[in-house]
Curated annotation (Swiss-Prot):
Cellular component, GO annotation: chloroplast thylakoid membrane; plasma membrane; proton-transporting ATP synthase complex
Subunit structure: F-type ATPases have 2 components, CF(1) - the catalytic core - and CF(0) - the membrane proton channel. CF(1) has five subunits: alpha(3), beta(3), gamma(1), delta(1), epsilon(1). CF(0) has four main subunits: a, b, b' and c.
Bilayer topology term: Multi-pass membrane protein
Pfam families (UniProt xref): ATP-synt_A
TM region(s), chain numbering: 38-58, 95-115, 134-154, 199-219, 220-240
Keywords tagged on the record: ATP synthesis, CF(0), Chloroplast, Hydrogen ion transport, Ion transport, Membrane, Plastid, Thylakoid, Transmembrane, Transmembrane helix, Transport
This protein's encoding gene: atpI
The UniProt record lists the keyword Electron transport: no
Domain of life of the source: Eukaryota
InterPro entries: ATP_syn_F0_a_bact/chloroplast, ATP_synth_F0_asu, ATP_synth_F0_asu_AS, F0_ATP_A_sf
Keyword Iron: no
Protein name per its UniProtKB record: ATP synthase subunit a, chloroplastic
Localisation: Plastid, Chloroplast thylakoid membrane
Species this protein is from: Spinacia oleracea (Spinach)
Function: Key component of the proton channel; it plays a direct role in the translocation of protons across the membrane.
Amino acid sequence: MNVLSYSINPLKGLYAISGVEVGQHFYWQIGGFQIHGQVLITSWVVIAILLGSAAIAVRSPQTIPTGGQNFFEYVLEFIRDVSKTQIGEEYRPWVPFIGTMFLFIFVSNWSGALLPWKIIQLPHGELAAPTNDINTTVALALLTSVAYFYAGLTKKGLGYFGKYIQPTPILLPINILEDFTKPLSLSFRLFGNILADELVVVVLVSLVPLVVPIPVMFLGLFTSGIQALIFATLAAAYIGESLEGHH
């Protein structure tokens, strides 16, 4: 009985820690679950922007691209280059995944600076970039983990797990730990940079509302784009490692 109560108490403690929040959040109650409504709202807006832009740009494709079609073809070529550089000759099936990651993160990051989220009033909390929430970045990182496991298992089958004892079985714990640190580093890097950028802008606007925050906002747009590129590049690199079967 004592052993059972001892095992339950730590679980309660972990559950309490997981409920710790930074700021206020707007929740939707669905069944027995609480869902961050503000994250879903902003994510849907970003997805609508991406789908709407793509539909408008390619609604009447031309042999010689112009305007929006030309821009989207340039973006596609850029994503192909990133995928091919990191993955190798087997990059083609992974272009849609890498492209989706890059575009969603890029538009999400920029939406925090360019879209007037503050205009929309919520009962609790406020709207912000989807990548400003740790839930979004963790979900993206876990999708990346699933992708590179799928890539390795599809190509090598169960032999994929042989990489954990290469070049020597002594490295087994370190190789296993690496698979846990990859999604952690991806998610916290993106979340930390976007949150810090928005906090700096908010503080500067409150202290010096004119002129001074503008250069910081432009710097934030630049770093937001870089963060999207870093995430997509690392995702492609992890997939490439799984396909090659070495570190």
